[in-house]
């Protein structure tokens, strides 16, 4: 009987580049993905895995609809899209922070209603709800940093790894909302049907993650 393939939806781009070495250290054959050319679906010739390369939001859709068994995607996408699938592992890469940023003259506690530009309206709304502040949120798909510089918004909520882009655009950080990293999530039905194979993969990846991110003992 042929062993069923685990379908792994992997966020293409930077997440893909950071995660492929982890998958390879865990023993997965990723040669087809590395030599992808223009393809987006890859079968391992030697192992029961199939890789699907997709944009982050689409990874969650593949999982929700059962088109993928495992998804590898940023926690920002999972939170913004309110994913209901099981999160099994923090892969320890793609580490960033959600920040509130604006120009030097921005007053974060001013009582007036603020306009906030962001790619993440749900996360932004929840943040200001916790603060008890009423804001207008404008969804921006491109360079969010432009919003306060052009007067489109008073401030922005965005992801930053080092803060360099924010500083280069003459903005400053006023608050840190929450950390972000790349997570491994699993379709609920797949976890029931292929539990042994999924947990075997998760265990191997967890060993790699622990090796690459040793804990500090005080």
From Swiss-Prot:
Keywords: Amino-acid biosynthesis, ATP-binding, Cytoplasm, Glycosyltransferase, Histidine biosynthesis, Nucleotide-binding, Transferase. InterPro entries: ATP_PRibTrfase_cat, ATP_PRibTrfase_CS, ATP_PRibTrfase_HisG, ATP_PRibTrfase_HisG_short. Pathway: Amino-acid biosynthesis; L-histidine biosynthesis; L-histidine from 5-phospho-alpha-D-ribose 1-diphosphate: step 1/9. GO terms for cellular component: cytoplasm. Its EC number is 2.4.2.17. Transmembrane segments: none annotated. It catalyses: 1-(5-phospho-beta-D-ribosyl)-ATP + diphosphate = 5-phospho-alpha-D-ribose 1-diphosphate + ATP. One of its GO terms (biological process) is L-histidine biosynthetic process. The keyword Transferase applies. It is found in: Cytoplasm. It comes from the Bacteria. One of its GO terms (molecular function) is ATP binding. The keyword Amino-acid biosynthesis applies. PROSITE patterns: ATP_P_PHORIBOSYLTR. It is an enzyme of class 2 (transferase). Pfam families: HisG. Its main location: cytoplasm. Belongs to the ATP phosphoribosyltransferase family. Short subfamily. Lacks the C-terminal regulatory region which is replaced by HisZ. Heteromultimer composed of HisG and HisZ subunits. Catalyzes the condensation of ATP and 5-phosphoribose 1-diphosphate to form N'-(5'-phosphoribosyl)-ATP (PR-ATP). Has a crucial role in the pathway because the rate of histidine biosynthesis seems to be controlled primarily by regulation of HisG enzymatic activity. This is ATP phosphoribosyltransferase.
